[in-house]
Amino acid sequence: MENIDIEKAPVISEGNKEKKGLKKWMCAKSSKFRSWWDDKRHKMDKWSRETPFRRKMWLNKTLYMMMIPYMVLFFLFTVVPVVMSFLLSFSYFNLLEAPRFIGWANYLALFLDDPIFITSIKNTLIIALITGPLGYLLSFVFAWLINELPNKLRAFITLVFYAPSISGSALAIWTLIFASDIYGYANSFLINWGLIREPITWLQDSAYILPIVIVVQLWMSLGVNFLTLIAGLKGVDRSQYEAGAVDGVKNRWQELWYITLPNMKPQLLFSAVLQISGSLGVGAITTALAGFPSVNYAGHTIVNHLQDYGTTRYEMGYASAIATLLFISAIILNKLIRKIIGRVGS
């Protein structure tokens, strides 16, 4: 665009000649500006019409501008660490020396020379296969039932379900329940009822550690998932049930499958992702209950193995290989869950 030089503008005087000259000069500059702007707008419109993606970007350019800070932070604190972890998994790196490329040696060592890692895979799969589907199902059933209650009672029960997931002392309650002396609630109950004579060392016996971890993880996972699903249930338009009754929906099960579930797919997917990440990421619970490492590695999970090599032994290349395998497993499960939830209501 040509800059408008104010100093070259005709001086306004009382004479008609000077006034006409100023008007002619301003019209010429305005015409040039309109021509320049029309040309720029035509180019931008042409660029935005080339592909559907560009068209959407142009129409929602303000929203994309607002997303830039988040995308920058996401790239720096999520994408970059994942890529760096993947690259380090092919190296030997102990924080004291520069990374040294060793190819697939870390991955081969995990599966061929590390029996504790195989144990951690087995324990993680057992926990995930039990707490994942069961926790997801229980969260939905409880949310579905409680959603029918009066508002005040529903709010109170929602708080009861959600409070343990945000309470830092929740795990301490379970250590009291499964304490190894006669003062533990579980031992006290069993002794008083004559079921046992001597207290059971729940958290020091490898036969009980994994079942206890499963129970605690299942209990801890209900809070956020329950809150997410009950929010989805509240968002379903009640008029759709009336329309469904006109279209032939005859009972509550048909309402659930054809109306309720299809209208809360975002909440179902979000809850499933939380459940998967929580089931695969079990580590803090086993450490808090059974110590690190647990007796005979009975509660040892992939996350515990990652912590062992990453924060205790500082073998960062080996730990990065573990983290990469865990990340890939989570991605595969998330893709599978998306396909399953996508068929809901069909």
Where are these regions (language model features)?
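Transmembrane alpha-helical segments of polytopic membrane transport and secretion proteins
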Residues: M1-M66, N151-R154, L336-S346
